[in-house]
Every structure is written in structure tokens, then in C-alpha cells.
Amino acid sequence: MARSFAQLARTAEKTKGSVAVPKEPLDHPPLQIHTLGNGVLRQSTRRIGKVDESVRDLVRDMLRSMYAAKGIGLAAPQVGIHKQLLVLDLDLETPTTPPVVLINPEIISSSATVETYEEGCLSIPGVYLNVVRPSEIVLSFRDEMGRPRKMKADGLMARCIQHEMDHLEGVLFVDRVTDENELSLELKEHGFKRADVRPLV
């Protein structure tokens, strides 16, 4: 049975070996976030086998780097690590809210209903454009302790998960933008090249 994000968050709060780190900016985050135009963002990823302390250390470094950039989601390929791992935290203002860690995530089902919403990305800073995605998803994954989980997500959480999972396939949100004129203008304004986009639509 798929559990909601809220249920998983409550479970995470009680779990020993938490990967949570202080939600504070760092002058020197442990990992560099790569940006559009760097080929590292387009490479395929590998599933994680054993979930051990080295994986949890990576999760902590990803969280520290995400918080330093004031982001709400980060996928391993964005920091040059080609593993199927992503972290999310939609509540940056509450120190006690645990992050969500998704290892080897797979979308089991998605709703026929779609929503259009503006997205941004730490790998394309300053660029915000509308993207169409399913409004609800159900996914399977392993948590930071290696336990198999299922989760149902909707709204912003569903969108963020889909956005970050795209990174695991070498896909960036700009690849899904349908408004060509707006895309070109936004990229140019923020110093990115239209040629680095790989349209999916």
C-alpha cells in the first residue's frame, strides 16, 4: 500500500541514523552543482546496490549542497555522481521537518490529469518556465536505510519528484518546455545556450 508523503515524513522523524543536516547556508558546500551545458548532466545513471553509510554520507553532502543553494530538490547527476539518488525538502523553514531521500526510484503509475506549473532548477539558475506533468504519481524506492517503500504524491511533491527523476535519465526541465520563444528568451537572458536543450516535445 502506497503511503503519503506526510506519513513517510513522520516515520523518518522516528528513524535512527537520520541523514538530516542543518538547513543553513554554507560558504563552501561539499559538492559542486553543475549547470546546463555541462555534459555530465546528460549521462545515464546506475542503480545503487547496497545502501550503506557511504550512501548516507553522500545524501548528507547532497542535502548540505542543496540547502546552500536554497533549493528544494537535488539529484545525484547534478553533482556529477551517476547514481539513482535524489533528495527533496519542501519545507526549508522548519528545521525539524525531515528531508525525503529516494534511492532507485521508479514511477509505478501516474494520473491522466496533468497540470502546468512553473519550474526552476539549480542547474539552470534564474530560468523559470512552465512545464506540463501528471498531477499525481505512485512510486517505489528505497529509503536511506535501504528499506523498500512506496509513496503516493501529488501537488508540488509529485512535480518535484518527476523533475528530479528526469535528471536520472539525463533530462532537464527545459527539454519539456513547449513555448519555444519564451524558452529562447529566458536562456539567453541568463547566459545559457539554446543548443544545449534537447527537446522532448
Swiss-Prot record:
Record EC number: 3.5.1.88
Keyword Transcription found: no
The entry's keywords: Hydrolase, Iron, Metal-binding, Protein biosynthesis
Stored InterPro entries: Peptide_deformylase, Peptide_deformylase_sf
A single BP term in Gene Ontology: translation
Cofactor binding summary note: Binds 1 Fe(2+) ion.
Binding site for Fe cation: C121, H163, H167
Active site: E164
GO molecular-function terms, A-Z: metal ion binding; peptide deformylase activity
PANTHER family, A to Z: PEPTIDE DEFORMYLASE
Family affiliation: Belongs to the polypeptide deformylase family.
Record-given protein name: Peptide deformylase 2
UniProt source species: Prochlorococcus marinus (strain MIT 9313)
